[in-house]
């Protein structure tokens, strides 16, 4: 999702009214707090479609609603990534395709050929037991998301996901819910 940044920044996306944008290099977590990826991460269970239900404000997703990420296996260590951003009226704004290399338990490096910034750290910090909800972050604290298999997230899983972000040093006051 981070690499969606370049496409949307270059396209000059505008924020929705009242939406905080954040800077490209804004940090949303205390980087002195250790960040922990999911040790028992099962990539095959992570595959499929995820809905972005919450995120930290970043320019590359300014104005995006109904954001989805689709993951499919390429081989044992590589996952295809397709991120879709929609306009508030539901029309498709942008789609970006890339790959994620598994570099450790719950740790991926995501790259998009059309983006000149190189690979980005994408750490799965937590999933619920059924892989219905996931928390994703980055050691540099410049991004973070709560993903869910359905557009609506149950309150108990949202609460658990927020606790994971807090545990990993993220500022919960800056987390914004995403309209589906």
Which residues does each PLM region occupy?
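Sec-dependent N-terminal signal peptides
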Residues: 3-11
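A beta-rich soluble binding module of mature secreted/lumenal proteins
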Residues: 13-180
């Amino acid at each position: 999702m981070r690499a969606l940044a370049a496409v949307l920044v270059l396209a000059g996306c505008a924020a929705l009214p009242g939406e905080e944008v954040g800077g490209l290099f804004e940090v949303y977590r205390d980087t002195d707090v250790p960040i922990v990826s999911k040790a028992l991460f099962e990539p095959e269970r992570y595959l499929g479609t995820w809905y972005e239900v919450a995120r930290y404000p970043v320019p590359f997703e300014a104005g995006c609603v109904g954001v989805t990420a689709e993951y499919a296996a390429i081989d044992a260590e590589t996952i295809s990534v397709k991120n879709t951003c929609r306009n508030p009226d539901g029309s498709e704004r942008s789609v970006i395709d890339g790959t994620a290399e598994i570099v450790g338990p719950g740790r991926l490096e995501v790259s998009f050929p059309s983006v000149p910034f190189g690979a980005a750290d994408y750490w799965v910090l937590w999933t619920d037991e059924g892989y219905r909800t996931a928390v994703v972050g980055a050691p540099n604290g410049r991004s973070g998301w709560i993903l869910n298999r359905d557009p609506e997230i149950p309150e108990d899983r949202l609460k658990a996901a927020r606790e994971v972000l807090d545990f990993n040093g993220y500022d919960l006051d800056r987390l914004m819910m995403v309209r589906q």
